[in-house]
């Protein structure tokens, strides 16, 4: 192989690596380590709330993505039962709620300061540009920077 051909090959190697990474990001499967989004209600939450503390242990809106993080898990570590939707969670119990339809859901939640929690389930990104953009946003974080 001639010297110019070697240099062309070496110069094209980084471009090929970048192109391969972009292709994988756009078309590669979504395989998270766990599809669960876990929240814990810590011990003493109810007592603090009854004492007048504004306890913010759960977000107002939980965002899930079908096929990626589409299972909500609540763990009650408190000393008293907690209600989430139609479910009564006794102390030490966990509640697992898988979602299969993209939508916005409202639940009664005694562990939440407002008594309500919203779960927004977004559709999973389809292969191609949409998945590439989704992975880029996930990599960059909420503020758009790493």
Locate each region found by the language model.
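Extracytoplasmic copper-binding redox domains, predominantly the cupredoxin/blue-copper superfamily
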Residues: 2-146
């Amino acid at each position: 192989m001639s010297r110019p051909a070697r240099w062309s090959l070496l110069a094209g190697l980084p471009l090929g690596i970048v192109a391969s990474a972009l292709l994988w990001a756009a078309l590669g499967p979504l395989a998270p380590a766990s599809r669960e989004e876990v929240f814990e209600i810590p011990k003493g939450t109810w007592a603090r709330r009854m004492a007048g503390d504004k306890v913010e242990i759960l977000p107002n809106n939980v965002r899930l993505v079908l096929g990626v993080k589409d299972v909500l898990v609540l763990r009650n570590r408190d000393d008293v039962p907690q209600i989430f939707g139609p479910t009564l969670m006794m102390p030490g119990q966990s509640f697992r709620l898988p979602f299969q339809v993209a939508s916005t859901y409202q639940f009664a939640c005694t562990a939440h300061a407002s008594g309500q929690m919203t779960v927004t389930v977004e559709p999973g990104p389809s292969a191609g540009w949409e998945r590439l953009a989704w992975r880029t946003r996930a990599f960059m974080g909420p503020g758009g920077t790493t």
